[in-house]
Curated annotation (Swiss-Prot):
Domain topic, free-text comment: Consists of two distinct domains; an N-terminal heme-containing oxygen-binding domain and a C-terminal reductase domain with binding sites for FAD and NAD(P)H.
UniProt feature coiled coil, ranges: none
EC number: 1.14.12.17
List of residues binding FAD: 196, 212-215, 397-400
Gene: hmp
Cofactor, how bound (note): Binds 1 heme b (iron(II)-protoporphyrin IX) group per subunit.
The protein's name: Flavohemoprotein
Region Reductase, residue ranges: 155-406
Record site feature (Influences the redox potential of the prosthetic heme and FAD groups), residues: 90, 396
Similarity-based family: Belongs to the globin family. Two-domain flavohemoproteins subfamily.
Length: 406
């Protein structure tokens, strides 16, 4: 990566560094305008970008954070490589192509000029054009490597491949699992617990294709994939695809999906105790990790903590209980915020610092968190207050990348 940075001369680098305060102040306004003009002039890209995230402003905020990070680290772009890889996983799952980068660059530069006005001099625009293509080349290089890796794996593929629903199981009041096997009956690639697939939902009533990522919710090594989807409110934009899956997709339905991707992954080389903490549908990648660790690391101590509204909202409750009862090294704790009965669960209300201290046996452990952003932010703060090293805390947020740790 350091080889790419030499393509930027000293003058360009200094100009980019000088714009960092401007990006901090106006970055989100620039990226909001960028998406507006990009999609107005390239409506076919609405088939790629999540329109719900566009309406909520989440995508523009995530892009603003990325642009700011790149500018702030323009002399040492290797510092943002973990962030680049995280985004690249998402890009590969969406089948983003190298030829789309110049289109994005064109409208990003237009947005910078139109939002900043006279402050965006020709010199600044020229510097950002150079910087953008250096950064784009880094993404393209990382993504090319990922595409090649997927293509060359046994059962691997790039782009989208048709899978047939072979089983549909209602797991709770809101969550249903879909078991998927390739329509061509050929092998499928394995995955690392915690990864996701992207579904291409072609809904008759919708003008554009919807692409959605769903975590794989079982251990790898099977001849099928399983996703477990929460049905969102049908009157909300966020619920378009989940309602389609719950109401219109049945056994025999065919769904195009991309190969597994994502960097929220279980490190099976680590033999320290494992603490898995999930909230709501954040259970799905955590369940994959639990299933995998009891299969491949049967002697590893595991603390499984799950927060749900009630017993009716807790997906895969019986399976987790079976594991905890049959595996002495697995300890299960369930917290209900709105329990049906006073005796339900190990705790009523919410996970808090004092309770967490009691159920976590050691600080020297690997922690994996998944759930709503406020949930993860609170748990992360509690763990840091317990002096857990940030490097030992791994988190997955469904949706555009946003900072969680303070």
């Amino acid at each position: 990566m350091s080889n790419t940075t030499v393509l930027l001369d000293k003058k360009t680098t200094e100009i980019i560094k000088a714009t960092v305060p401007v990006l901090k102040e106006h970055g989100e306004a620039i990226t909001k305008h960028f998406y507006k003009i990009l999609l107005e002039n390239n409506p076919e890209l609405k088939n790629v970008f999540n329109q719900t995230n566009q309406r909520k402003g989440a995508q523009s905020k995530a892009l603003a954070n990325t642009v700011y990070a790149a500018a702030a680290n323009i002399e040492k772009l290797e510092e943002i490589l973990p962030h680049v890889k995280q985004i690249a996983h998402k890009h590969v799952s969406l089948n983003i192509k190298p030829e789309q980068y110049p289109i994005v660059g064109k409208y990003l530069l237009i947005a910078i000029k139109e939002v900043l006005g006279d402050a965006a001099t020709d010199e600044i625009i020229e510097a950002w054009e150079k910087a953008y293509f250096v950064i784009a080349d880094i993404f393209i290089s990382v993504e090319k490597e990922m595409y090649n890796e997927k293509k060359n794996q046994i059962g691997g593929w790039t782009g989208f491949r048709d899978f047939k629903v072979i089983k549909k199981v209602k797991e709770s009041k809101e969550i249903t699992s879909f078991y998927l096997k390739p329509d061509d009956n050929l092998p499928i690639t394995t995955f690392i617990p915690g990864q996701y697939i992207t579904i291409k939902a072609q809904i008759e009533s919708e003008a554009y294709v919807h692409l959605r990522q769903y975590s794989l919710s079982t251990a790898p090594g099977k001849d099928y994939y399983r996703i477990s989807v929460k049905r969102e409110a049908s009157n909300q934009p966020i619920g378009v695809v989940s309602n389609y899956l719950h109401t219109s997709v049945e056994v025999g339905s065919v769904l195009p999906i991309s190969a597994p991707a994502g960097d929220f992954i279980l490190d099976e080389r680590d033999h320290r105790p494992l603490v898995l903490i999930s909230g709501g549908v954040g259970l799905t990648p955590i369940m994959s990790m639990l299933e995998s660790v009891v299969e491949h690391q049967p002697n590893r101590n595991v603390v499984f903590i799950h927060a749900a509204k009630s017993i009716d909202h807790q997906a895969m409750r019986k399976r987790v209980s079976e594991i905890a009862k049959s595996k002495e090294q697995v300890k299960q704790y369930v917290v209900y915020s709105n329990p049906t009965n006073r005796t339900d669960g190990d705790k009523q209300g919410y996970i808090d610092y004092e309770w967490l201290k009691e159920v976590i046996p050691t600080k020297d452990a690997a922690f994996y968190l998944c759930g709503p952003k406020p949930f993860m932010s609170a748990i992360n703060n509690d763990l840091q207050n317990m002096n857990i090293a940030q490097n030992d805390i791994h988190m997955e947020l469904f949706g555009p990348l946003e900072p969680i740790a303070k």
